[in-house]
């Protein structure tokens, strides 16, 4: 069994075109993601899956491995599934989905994610969550929340404030902020990519709900650190000072 980290990265973005190559402290963002992810001791291989030759060339330029995929994928998960097929992974291999716009990724997050998948044979995929009490995040529909059962399996993901406090407390309850990193068995990744989208997925615009709607369990690991993705130039401004303090993701 191999554990392969795949970083889906596309050049076109409606809110921030070319963001994988945007300079952060002298390096393209994709290099920060790659080098910080490479510190995860559990990974046997790390690859950037992209539809853009410029991104592939940038990755090769700093000594990383890149794989060109089709440009017509509807989601990063579909790109991931194609990459896994091109790599001819065994069904028992583990694929870790590391977002290409997460320059604050920490190797301990990846290690916790892989451990969670390996320890629960009833769940073919795993993801991460970070405990929070931020009222702003609790009420922000762009911050996805997750609730768990007692076995640390996801009951539901939502953009709405969950768990909802019926009695209207002024402060946010302790909740779990979902972090969009995933690990799958390679065989389930192909199964997932072929599943038809579900109604809840369509309403919430959350792809992971597809697994729950089709009856597949998702194990959730508590991340040792929080992170922040880069969707806009404003997000980039916020992550630069954090990276300046922790350039290697110690």
UniProtKB/Swiss-Prot annotation:
Keywords: Cytoplasm, Lipopolysaccharide biosynthesis, Nucleotidyltransferase, Transferase. It comes from the Bacteria. GO terms for cellular component: cytosol. It comes from Syntrophobacter fumaroxidans (strain DSM 10017 / MPOB). Its EC number is 2.7.7.38. Belongs to the KdsB family. It is found in: Cytoplasm. One of its GO terms (molecular function) is 3-deoxy-manno-octulosonate cytidylyltransferase activity. Activates KDO (a required 8-carbon sugar) for incorporation into bacterial lipopolysaccharide in Gram-negative bacteria. This is 3-deoxy-manno-octulosonate cytidylyltransferase. Pathway: Nucleotide-sugar biosynthesis; CMP-3-deoxy-D-manno-octulosonate biosynthesis; CMP-3-deoxy-D-manno-octulosonate from 3-deoxy-D-manno-octulosonate and CTP: step 1/1; Bacterial outer membrane biogenesis; lipopolysaccharide biosynthesis. The lineage of its organism: Bacteria, Pseudomonadati, Thermodesulfobacteriota, Syntrophobacteria, Syntrophobacterales. It is an enzyme of class 2 (transferase). Pfam families: CTP_transf_3 (PF02348). HAMAP family: KdsB. Its main location: cytoplasm. GO terms for biological process: CMP-keto-3-deoxy-D-manno-octulosonic acid biosynthetic process; lipopolysaccharide biosynthetic process. It catalyses: 3-deoxy-alpha-D-manno-oct-2-ulosonate + CTP = CMP-3-deoxy-beta-D-manno-octulosonate + diphosphate.
């Amino acid at each position: 069994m191999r554990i392969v980290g795949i970083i889906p990265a596309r050049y076109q973005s409606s809110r921030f075109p070319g963001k994988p190559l945007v300079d952060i402290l002298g390096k393209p963002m994709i290099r920060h993601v790659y080098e910080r992810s490479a510190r995860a001791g559990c990974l046997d291989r790390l690859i950037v899956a992209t539809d853009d030759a410029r991104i592939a060339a940038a990755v090769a330029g700093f000594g990383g491995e890149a794989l060109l995929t089709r440009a017509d994928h509807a989601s990063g998960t579909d790109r991931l599934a194609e990459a896994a097929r091109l790599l001819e992974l065994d069904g028992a291999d583990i694929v870790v989905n590391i977002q290409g716009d997460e320059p604050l990724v920490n190797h301990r997050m990846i290690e916790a994610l892989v451990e969670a998948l390996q320890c629960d044979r009833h769940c073919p995929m795993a993801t991460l969550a970070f405990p929070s009490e931020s009222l702003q995040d609790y009420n922000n529909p762009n911050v996805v929340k997750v609730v768990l059962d007692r076995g640390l399996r996801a009951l539901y993901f939502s953009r709405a404030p969950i768990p909802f406090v019926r009695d209207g407390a002024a402060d946010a309850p302790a909740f779990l902020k979902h972090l969009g990193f995933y690990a799958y068995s390679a065989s389930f990744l192909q199964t997932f990519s072929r599943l038809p989208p579900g109604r809840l997925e369509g309403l919430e615009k959350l792809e992971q709900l597809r697994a729950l709607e089709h009856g597949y369990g998702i194990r959730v690991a508590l991340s040792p650190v929080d992170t922040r993705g880069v969707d806009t130039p404003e997000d980039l401004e916020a992550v630069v000072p954090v990276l300046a303090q922790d350039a290697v993701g110690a």
